[in-house]
Amino acid sequence: MENNIVNLEVEYFKRKNQEAYQTLMNKEFEKVNELLQEPLDKIEKSVKGETYCPQNIFEAGIFLNFLDKKVEQKDFAKVNYYDFYLMSAAANYNLNLLEKSREDYIKAIEFNPASSIARLQVLEIDKRQKNYATYLEDVKEFFKYAYRRSDIAKAYRDVGYYLYEVKDYEMALVAYYLSNVYEFTETAINEIKHIGETEKIDLDSKAWLSEKMMGEFHNKYKIPLLPSEKLTSLAIAMANDAESKKAFPVARFAYQVAYELTLEEGYLKKIEEMKNM
């Protein structure tokens, strides 16, 4: 739980957050680290136990429903500690201090396990350093919390990159194809073409898109082909509950998540119906 955090401290952290954010936007990365040193020291000394910093109502729902914590341990932070580690990680990444950046992203994940930003950046750093020891495990952990289509697409591209590196070319094609299912990008298309040309794979045959290949991809690497059913059920339940209570902003947000995970047009209609509520 949070210890020794009083209202004055909350204001202090808000001020430091704003200062560091503006400095980060100005790309003064060394100065960002200077500004963050004191608040990060305070966080290390003051925050004990399990504390969580959801960035939206759906992430709060993930925390309350799925994270493996005893009820009495659950605590929402008064201060967005997650942000401080995210900014430190970004500054260190831009200074090419990749190990420190990775450590900061891991710390950010501790405060917000549902952070796609931090999880995808850990994968990016591991790609740059060719550190693949826990790569697939980290990808699988990402998919437990992924609820944005663009993030899911990026994760599949990361898997495609990894599989190309380990010379599993046909499975890399499957990963890049799945990426485009969630968000079409020229990056994925170009990688597919590159693999086809360099490895002499007949892309026109579509054999690499077969149900058999999809099954092999899933069975071999245990990477899901679909978004988390738990998250989908949570989004729908949250949306229905919020709508019944006339909490329309929450309902719209949850229906948007449900749409991203399912592409069910009915959820878009729901959002439109509640647009002015």
Which residues make up each language-model segment?
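Flexible helix-coil transition and linker loops at the boundaries of alpha-helical arrays
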Residues: 4-6, 42-81, 143-152, 223-225
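Alpha-helical linker/edge segments of TPR/alpha-solenoid repeat scaffolds
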Residues: 59-76, 129-138, 161-171, 196-219, ...
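TPR-repeat structural position
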Residues: 29-30, 98, 132, 169-170, ...
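Residue-level recognition of tetratricopeptide repeat
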Residues: 21, 90, 124, 161-162, ...
